[in-house]
Amino acid sequence: MGPTIPPESFIDLLLDALCVVDRDGYVRYVSAASERVFGYLPEEMIGRRILDFVHPEDLEKTRQAVKEILRGELKPYFENRYIRKDGSTAHIMWSARWSEKEQIRVAVARDVTQRKRAEAMQAAMYAISDAANSSDSLPAMFRRIHQVVEGLM
């Protein structure tokens, strides 16, 4: 067997961001993938509250998930949205747990924004198809299609 490889040398190769957050919600560590996932360099996130980055509409459900994690519940598939540094929205899937011994939350964040866009497009295509097949008149069909397209914007 070869020499032991220090974790830092391969953690920064991960495509997903590894995050460590303390009990009070402050980021204590985030891997280099934070730039790809959140749009922030690690040093821009460390020391800040993780909730500062959460999309305002997702704050309450995120706070609830944090409470559950702090009670020891595992969260393998929690999704919420973050506001990237450039102002765009990132859809994030989290896998997280609490370490009572270390008093930290350890989580892996995966950017699922492209998947969410594809799902929205697929749902829109179904809705447009449904409108085309079920509308009684052209104006009604156009109104429904316009509503669907507007929802994508």
Regions found by a protein language model. Name each.
Residues 2-19, 23, 123:
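Sensory modules in modular signal-transduction proteins
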Residues 26, 71-74, 78-92, 103:
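Per-ARNT-Sim (PAS) sensory domains and their PAS-associated C-terminal
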Residues 34-45, 56:
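PAS/PAS-like sensory domain cap-loop motif
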Residues 56-67:
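PAS/Per-ARNT-Sim sensory domains
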Residues 113-134, 139-140:
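Signal-transmission linkers at sensory-effector interfaces
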Residues 1-8, 61, 110-121, 151:
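PAS-associated C-terminal cap
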Residues 93-108:
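Short loop/turn elements at sensory-signaling interfaces that couple input to output
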